[in-house]
């Protein structure tokens, strides 16, 4: 990401920060720990070229060094406590994951490396191969940033068949697969998933209960991107109830403050009819009246639930500021 991309991202993130805040404290209350790791430097990455179509380009010599370094750091932190290793269909994530898989295998760890297509980068479509520091690079970012703020029906400018709903279904499906494979393990199992910058950052902000836009804004200012090569984003919890633990090494408070809590309440409220509407749209395309009826019933239930939960969530958040009493 270069200067123009940074300008756009900072503008949008700063707008979000007008209504959110953070407070210290973190508590362990999750079902699994999921450590997302961005790939090391790839050939197109180093050249500043948008590269989202698998398999993409391989790692550079620098990227290979980064992969070895992050493998040692992850093994040092989790040891043989890693329940599962995952990567995307992109060559750069597979080559980044390989050193960790090799080190774990050498130490007698039985976890195998599994490839999940849902961990692929957000498709750039018509902008594939363009410079990241270009108008096309800026347009590529607009829809994903909108999804992070709750406007999930905004289509990917480069590929209108992709929107926040389809992206969340795809990446979230991969996360669901990871969760189902390890949630029954003893204690709080840890999984490591190698993916790409945009996919990790956007899906995390869309799904955690404590999205910290200030951390992301700081990242953009310092690195001109959402996450540096081999940067890590750690979340904890279960599908539908994820908490952001740390972002590129910066601890994130579990209690994000009233502003962020109200933002999440509103995000959940406005997303429900969008997801429901897209389900109905897909059902219409199927041509099946049974599928359509099921989609409509599910949509009504989803929207009713969101409408009922919104005032309760807002009330709980507000009284929480006063220690649970008014």
Briefly describe each language-model feature range:
Residues 2-10, 15-25:
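C-terminal segment of classical bacterial N-terminal signal peptides
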Residues 72-80, 98-106, 176-184, 205-209, ...:
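Sec-exported extracytoplasmic/periplasmic mature domains
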């Amino acid at each position: 990401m270069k200067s123009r991309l940074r300008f756009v991202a900072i503008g949008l993130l700063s707008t979000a920060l007008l209504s959110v805040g953070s407070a210290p404290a973190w508590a362990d209350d999750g079902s699994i720990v999921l450590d997302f790791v961005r790939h090391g430097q790839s050939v197109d990455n180093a050249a500043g070229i948008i590269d989202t179509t698998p398999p993409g380009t391989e790692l550079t010599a620098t990227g290979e060094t980064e992969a070895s370094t992050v493998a040692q750091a992850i093994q040092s932190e989790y040891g043989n406590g890693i329940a599962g290793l995952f990567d995307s269909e992109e060559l750069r994530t597979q080559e980044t994951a390989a050193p960790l898989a090799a080190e774990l295998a050498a130490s007698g760890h039985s976890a195998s490396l599994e490839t999940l297509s849902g961990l692929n980068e957000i498709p750039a479509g018509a902008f594939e191969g363009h410079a990241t520091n270009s108008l096309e690079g800026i347009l590529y970012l607009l829809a994903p940033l909108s999804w992070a703020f709750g406007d999930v029906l905004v289509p990917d400018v480069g590929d209108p068949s992709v929107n926040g709903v389809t992206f969340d279904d795809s990446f979230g499906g991969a996360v669901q697969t990871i969760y189902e494979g390890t949630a029954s393990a003893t204690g709080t199992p840890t999984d490591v998933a190698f993916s790409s910058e945009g996919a990790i950052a956007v899906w995390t902000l869309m799904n955690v209960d404590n999205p910290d836009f200030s951390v992301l804004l700081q990242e953009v200012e310092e690195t001109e991107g959402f996450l540096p090569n081999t940067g890590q984003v750690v979340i904890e919890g279960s599908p539908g109830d994820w908490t952001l633990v740390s972002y590129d090494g910066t601890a994130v408070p579990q209690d994000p403050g009233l502003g962020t809590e109200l933002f999440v309440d509103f995000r959940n409220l406005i997303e429900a009819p969008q997801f429901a509407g897209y389900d109905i749209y897909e059902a219409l395309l199927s041509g099946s009246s049974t599928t359509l009826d099921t989609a409509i019933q599910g949509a009504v239930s989803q929207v009713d639930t969101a409408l009922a939960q919104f005032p309760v969530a807002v009330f709980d958040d507000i009284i929480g500021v006063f220690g649970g009493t008014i």
